[in-house]
Amino acid sequence: MSASKLWSCTETVLNGGIKLFLYSSKNTKLRVAIGEVPGPMVHGAVSFVTEADSDDGLPHTLEHLVFMGSKKYPFKGVLDVIANRCLADGTNAWTDTDHTAYTLSTVGSDGFLKVLPVYINHLLTPMLTASQFATEVHHITGEGNDAGVVYSEMQDHESEMESIMDRKTKEVIYPPFNPYAVDTGGRLKNLRESCTLEKVRDYHKKFYHLSNMVVTVCGMVDHDQVLEIMNNVENEHMSTVPDHFPKPFSFALSDIKESTVHRVECPTDDASRGAVEVAWFAHSPSDLETHSSLHVLFDYLSNTSVAPLQKDFILLEDPLASSVSFHIAEGVRCDLRLNFAGVPVEKLDECAPKFFDKTVREHLEEANFDMERMGYLIDQTILNELVKLETNAPKDIMSHIIGHQLFDNEDEELFKKRTNEIDFLKKLKSEPASYWVQLVNKYFTAPSATVIGVPNEELVDKIAEEEEKRIAAQCEKLGKKGLEEAGKSLEAAILENTANHPSAELLDQLIVKDLEAFDRFPVQSLTSNSPSLTPQQSTFLAQFPFHANLHNCPTKFVEIFFLLDSSNLSIEDRSYLFLYTDLLFESPAMIDGVLTSADDVAKHFTKDLIDHSIQVGVSGLYDRFVNLRIKVGADKYPLLAKWAQIFTQGVVFDPSRIHQCAQKLAGEARDRKRDGCTVASTAVASMVYGKNTNCILFDELVLEKLHEKISKDVMKNPEAVLEKLEQVRSALFSNGVNAHFVADVDSIDPKMLSSDLWTWVQADPRFGPGHQFSAEAGENVSLELGKELLIGVGGSESSFIYQTSFLDANWNSEELIPAMIFGQYLSQCEGPLWRAIRGDGLAYGANVFVKPDRKQITLSLYRCAQPAVAYERTRDIIRKIVESGEISKAEFEGAKRSTVFEMMKREGTVSGAAKISILNNFRQTPHPFNIDLCRRIWNLTSEEMVKIGGPPLARLFDEKCFVRSIAVHPSKLNEMKKAFPGSSKIKISDLQFAC
């Protein structure tokens, strides 16, 4: 009997592009969704509806504990070991307010189908032992500190302004202990005191069973094979399905009775900026039309410089915020949030009243809606839904399936409607202004809750003092004997967790043994000199008066990456580059010889373009280049040339816009200063790269003081600032231009192809000759070897360490693959660092990254609970492995296969494959290089890995060969100075550009 005979099936096509099948078991309520997404990757998710009623973090702690082993596979981390051996890079999961989802991605379907039944076995029958709870959730160390993987993770959120405000909003709008009000991640106090193993076991029994489970698979897989696996799962676990399972979230929520305002104080190093959040209850989650309409309305109100909220709050001489954004959280009643970030502390009380009194009031009148712009926005939204089919279809499918699982009560029509949003968006375009007025009136005039996040520098020290007192009291209560017992208990837990190991026979069954021919996207990298061009390709490439590459691939869109070389910028001019790029989409411009206002420019590009952006670097690498990216439908190809000209030549710098943008960027920098990871990253970059490089100077945090100064200078002496920006433009033009086009050239009407579209480049004397750009790996690196920086960040309770050394290798070097595999061997899920650092609760993440394009090896210790101990143990483990050469064969095979996964994941979508093709031009590697690289990885021996890859790893811990940055809470500065005596204490201001 075919496996599918035991299932009923509902079929639809995701937004007209990808076939989607939803199978429902005839025996239980188990459902399996399969989306036929093309490409080499197979992505999966197993989701459960999960409801909590306390801050104990039961959904989150359970999410962590299921990975510790199952009753059938009672080996810590075996799931990730098997996943690595089956061409994955471990597994992952997330916990949300109303569901928990577990993910798996592999190259090809063979490995996916091997791992899936083992994965589900872990989910349905986890071990859930006391020793696992101790190391993974919370324990007290022999020194009296609190630790654990979950505890380390949640430390980073406890004192964040965003988290504090969110908790307050939930407290105000939901009843006490309501599932939407509690912190599903777990509060630190609860993790220490009230979260217990018994509660976790009861929680698992209640929610983790077949009738509450949906499996989603995206990729080219055999449906019968997937369903056969699920038949076996169902037969094995049928007895665990409860006779009666009350549907979670089966309650009603009352309206917010009256509008209220609440203030919460938040610890921060910079008390000049706070935040404001406004919340409302809105529609039912099954009202998909209103959901789509609100997203469009939010775009209308907030996106681009012509948007009302931009004008009312950001683009002002004296801004009220640096950014404004909307968010909808689906639930029994959808929860709308409006967030103002970077609000000057003296204006915190002005944001919400102005929103209601001006923005909302004005949009209760039909005449104030620009319906032409609204139509452009809806068209753009439709096109972006189609783009997602090429760029991120698995994520889109999983989101729809989980939404259906949570809210649609197994209604097939709602399922089809949810997965075909474009049908409704097309109808939405015909709605009159009165429709949008009704939406504004219905939701934004309803009672709301406003929460104001007030920054408080004194709280940083107060919280630190309270934590010190708490730990001191904890140590006193335990006493010397109790601390010794705590240390011994931890050691015993670690020993128990790691006592059992899978047999060689089991591991041999669960491995992909052959490197298969994956279903890759065909991409041709072509220039006008390429042999065997088709007539259409030849005509296309003959248009350009500069060097151009065509990356011909199966896409419905045309995308240009318009590159400018910034090597001629002085350090003073380069410090203006961030502002320059920000202004390109926010300024007036010459269009068809007419000076057009910034508002009308924004309106025009919303009409003409699907997407556009500007950044430094090519896919985040080769930062010397400034990269203007524009995307249109194939039927609008000529618009690429039009808008490339407008954004480069046509922009007219306006003093008022410069003032507004500079203030906005300074405000965004203040938000970034609260994040320890960001600060540590900026600090290490300051020691790795040359001072006059984009790697240093294209950073809002570094440029905060300069942007503040420019915002003032441009009002006093606009000519000087305008001259500086024009110098930046001329310097960028001086090296000419290169372009990379991503398109299916045969989908472009030949009549549209004309060299006349690009004559403006030749006509502008500022453009240098458009010779082919080249770059060297690591060309911006200028390591200050031996330097160490230690910096306090009051907005975060976690610690972060980055350590970087030089790697003398590029993509063609013999040393590269052994070093890459060695880094992956150490860092892989359930590898040496994972077990010793994350597994013992010292830090949330410990990874070694080998970066050939930057010629660097970097150690990252992320969200450390015990940073000094985590670092010392990491160093000792790596040194021991390098010196002894002792390698686990099973883990080595897993490292090779998970590295193949990383290589192939980058070309897992057609857009990703095209970006790899572009990068190959700078790496000076042929287009099929990825396949050759995978073969070389596959054939590497462990002896070669240690012999060739070991020395670069050893240099990472030679004090003469590395730089190090450490970001910690200010209360830990003295402790870290003792642990790292060679480090220099600095302030965030020391990282900033001197102006």
From Swiss-Prot:
Spans traversing the lipid bilayer: none
Gene3D superfamilies: Metalloenzyme, LuxS/M16 peptidase-like
UniProt signal peptide: none
Pfam family membership, one: Peptidase_M16_C
GO molecular function terms attached to this record: metal ion binding
Name of protein: Uncharacterized protein C05D11.1
